[in-house]
Curated annotation (Swiss-Prot):
Cystine pairings recorded for this chain: none
GO molecular function annotations of the record: Hsp90 protein binding
Tissue note: Specifically expressed in testis and sperm.
Domain spans labelled PPIase FKBP-type: 43-132
Protein origin, superkingdom: Eukaryota
Compartment(s) where it occurs, according to its Swiss-Prot or TrEMBL record: Cytoplasm, Cytosol; Nucleus
Self-association state and partner proteins as the record states: Interacts with HSP72/HSPA2 and CLTC. Interacts with GAPDH; leading to inhibit GAPDH catalytic activity. Interacts (via TPR repeats) with HSP90.
Protein name from the UniProt record: Inactive peptidyl-prolyl cis-trans isomerase FKBP6
Keyword set, alphabetical order: Cytoplasm, Differentiation, Meiosis, Nucleus, Repeat, RNA-mediated gene silencing, Spermatogenesis, TPR repeat
Record keyword Cytoplasm present: yes
Length: 316
C-alpha cells in the first residue's frame, strides 16, 4: 500500500513529494506558485522574502518578511546558507517555493545554538520578487575606455540600463548615496561612448533617463545646486521635458531663487497642465514667496520706522 510510513515526522512526510535539486536529497523543493522568465543567474543580486522554520514550530526562527522593502542580496556574498543559494538558482521571478535543507546545506552538524539544534533539517519558504544580474555590468565597467569601445553600442546601452536599474532599486530603498553612484556609472558609460549619427538618439534617450534620475537623487540628498545642474543637462537633450523642468523648478525653490523656480515650473505646467505634482509645487512656491516678501516688508519696516527713544531725546 502507498502513503506515509507510521512514525514519520512532518518533514519526512513532506519530503516524499518534493523535488531533489541537489542530487543527494540535501535540498528538496516544492513549488507553491510558479514564476516566469529566466532562471536566476549565478552572479545575480536577488530580492527575496523568506521565512525559516524548525520542525514542529509554527513561528519562524528567521524571516525578513517584516521589512517593507527587503534588501538586495548578491549570490556568493550575502547569502550564508548553501541550500538557499542552490534553491534560488532553481527559481524564476514571481515564484514562491518551499525548501527542505538538510544540515549539510544549512547549519551543519553543530547547528547554531541556542536557536538551531545540532544536525537540524530546516524548512524555508522563499518568494523571489526580482533579480538583477550584475556580473556582465561589473566586468564591463572594469574595462578601460579603449576596451569598452570594442563592443557594439547595444552592449553599452544594456550595461548602462542595468546600472540604472540598480540605482532605481537603491533609490526605492532610500539609499540615495548608493543610487547616485550607480547612476553616475551609467552616465559615464554613455558619455564616453560615441555613436554614428543614425544611432545617437539611442544614446541621448538613455542619457536623459539617467540625468533625470540624478537630478531627483540630488534633491533627496539636499544638494539642489547639483540637482539643477543635472536637470539643465537633461533640458539640453529635451528642452520641453516636463520632468526635467519640474526638477529644475524644485531645485531653484530650495535655493530660494523664486523667479527661476517660477519660470521652470510654469513651463512644466504648460507641458502637463493637469500634473498634480507640478501644480502643488507652484502652490508651494507661491506660499514660500509670500512668506519671503512678508519677512522683507517686516525687516524694512523695522529698519525705517522712527525710534521712540530718539524722538524723545530730540524733544529735550
Amino acid at each position: 500500500m502507498g502513503g506515509s510510513a507510521p512514525g514519520q515526522s512532518p518533514y519526512q512526510r513532506l519530503s516524499q513529494r518534493m523535488l531533489d535539486i541537489s542530487g543527494d536529497r540535501g535540498v528538496l523543493k516544492d513549488v507553491i506558485r510558479e514564476g516566469a522568465g529566466e532562471l536566476v543567474t549565478p552572479d545575480a543580486s536577488v530580492l527575496v522574502k523568506y521565512s525559516g522554520y524548525l520542525e514542529h514550530m509554527d513561528k519562524p526562527f528567521d524571516s525578513n518578511c517584516f521589512r517593507k522593502t527587503p534588501r538586495l542580496m548578491k549570490l556568493g556574498e550575502d547569502i550564508t546558507l548553501w541550500g538557499m543559494e542552490l534553491g534560488l538558482l532553481s527559481m524564476r521571478r514571481g515564484e514562491l517555493a518551499r525548501f527542505l535543507f538538510k544540515p549539510t546545506y544549512a547549519y551543519g552538524t553543530l547547528g547554531c545554538p541556542p536557536l538551531i539544534p545540532p544536525n537540524t533539517t530546516v524548512l524555508f519558504e522563499i518568494e523571489l520578487l526580482d533579480f538583477l544580474d550584475s556580473a556582465e555590468s561589473d566586468k564591463f565597467c572594469a574595462l578601460s575606455a579603449e576596451q569598452q569601445d570594442q563592443f557594439p553600442l547595444q552592449k553599452v546601452l544594456k550595461v548602462a540600463a542595468t546600472e540604472r536599474e540598480f540605482g532605481n532599486y537603491l533609490f526605492r530603498q532610500h539609499r540615495f548615496y548608493d543610487a547616485k553612484v550607480r547612476y553616475k556609472r551609467a552616465l559615464l558609460l554613455l558619455h564616453r561612448r560615441s555613436a554614428p549619427p543614425e544611432e545617437q538618439h539611442l544614446v541621448e534617450a538613455a542619457k536623459l533617463l539617467v540625468l533625470l534620475n540624478l537630478s531627483f537623487t540630488y534633491l533627496k540628498l539636499e544638494r539642489p545646486t547639483t540637482a539643477l545642474c543635472y536637470g539643465e543637462q537633461a533640458l539640453v537633450i529635451d528642452q520641453k521635458n516636463a520632468k526635467a523642468l519640474f526638477r529644475c523648478g524644485q531645485a531653484c525653490l530650495l535655493m530660494t531663487e523664486y523667479q527661476k523656480a517660477r519660470d521652470f515650473l510654469v513651463q512644466a505646467q504648460k507641458a502637463q497642465p493637469f500634473n498634480h505634482d507640478i501644480n502643488n509645487e507652484l502652490k508651494k512656491l507661491a506660499s514660500c514667496y509670500k512668506d519671503y516678501t512678508d519677512k522683507e516688508k517686516e525687516m524694512c519696516h523695522r529698519m525705517f520706522a522712527p525710534c521712540d527713544d530718539d524722538s524723545a531725546v530730540g524733544e529735550n
